[in-house]
Amino acid sequence: MPNYKLLYFNMRGRAEIIRYIFAYLDIKYEDHRIEQADWPKIKPTLPFGKIPVLEVEGLTLHQSLAIARYLTKNTDLAGKTELEQCQVDAVVDTLDDFMSLFPWAEENQDLKERTFNDLLTRQAPHLLKDLDTYLGDKEWFIGNYVTWADFYWDICSTTLLVLKPDLLGIYPRLVSLRNKVQAIPAISAWILKRPQTKL
């Protein structure tokens, strides 16, 4: 088993999907969390100057979803068939497209607040309606078993609920999916032991 070192800020953010996958697959890794004050000196040393990165076998891998795909490849978390793998990727990319619209680093607070409000009140309902329709009466997004698309939904929706606690009020099936992910023993154990951060 390779030695893994995950580098990210002390927050869930874009690294949490990697941590969920490590937890579920029971893979040991170093969860290295850096302070914001140290970021300016660390940034120039990394590929493309972004985190998270995963150090493995002398390589520094970047892009959280690429890392997630690397870790889930050849496991059922990625989907059992090529068609299911495409469906998993499509749900993940749909969620990521939306989450990437948020101007997390915007310094103009008025603009940031207006944009967040627009995304949460006007655009999120369209996404949630589509996700609810896609899920339907199934237990999981794809197939009859958990995939990392379900993990990513739980992670993204946790952040969205911090920003707008009533967001899922009319989507009990999406809430139920969150609950099912969080009830998986390995995920539940991780949630209990992880550092408590807002985002």
From Swiss-Prot:
Subcellular localization, as worded in the UniProt entry: Cytoplasm
GO terms for MF: calcium ion binding; glutathione transferase activity; magnesium ion binding; prostaglandin-D synthase activity; protein homodimerization activity
Cofactor: glutathione
Lipid biosynthesis as UniProt keyword: yes
Cofactor note: Glutathione is required for the prostaglandin D synthase activity.
GO CC field: cytoplasm
Domain GST C-terminal: residue ranges: 81-199
Keywords, in A-Z order: Cytoplasm, Fatty acid biosynthesis, Fatty acid metabolism, Isomerase, Lipid biosynthesis, Lipid metabolism, Prostaglandin biosynthesis, Prostaglandin metabolism, Transferase
Catalytic activity annotation: prostaglandin H2 = prostaglandin D2; RX + glutathione = an S-substituted glutathione + a halide anion + H(+); 2-glyceryl-prostaglandin H2 = 2-glyceryl-prostaglandin D2
InterPro entries given in the database record: Glutathione-S-Trfase_C-like, Glutathione-S-Trfase_C_sf, Glutathione_S-Trfase, Glutathione_S-Trfase_N, GST_C, GST_superfamily, Thioredoxin-like_sf
Top-rank taxon, per record: Eukaryota
Effect of residue 198 to E: Moderate reduction of protein expression levels. No significant effect on catalytic activities
Effect the entry attributes to changing residue 14 to K: Moderate reduction of protein expression levels. Abolishes both prostaglandin D synthase and glutathione-conjugating activities
Effect of residue 156 to L: No significant effect on protein expression levels. Abolishes prostaglandin D synthase and significantly reduces glutathione-conjugating activities
Main location group: cytoplasm
CDD domains, per database record: GST_C_Sigma, GST_N_Sigma_like
One GO BP annotation of this record: prostaglandin metabolic process
Family membership noted in the UniProt record: Belongs to the GST superfamily. Sigma family.
Function: Bifunctional enzyme which catalyzes both the conversion of PGH2 to PGD2, a prostaglandin involved in smooth muscle contraction/relaxation and a potent inhibitor of platelet aggregation, and the conjugation of glutathione with a wide range of aryl halides and organic isothiocyanates. Also exhibits low glutathione-peroxidase activity towards cumene hydroperoxide.
Subunit structure of this chain's protein: Homodimer.
Name used for this protein in its record: Hematopoietic prostaglandin D synthase
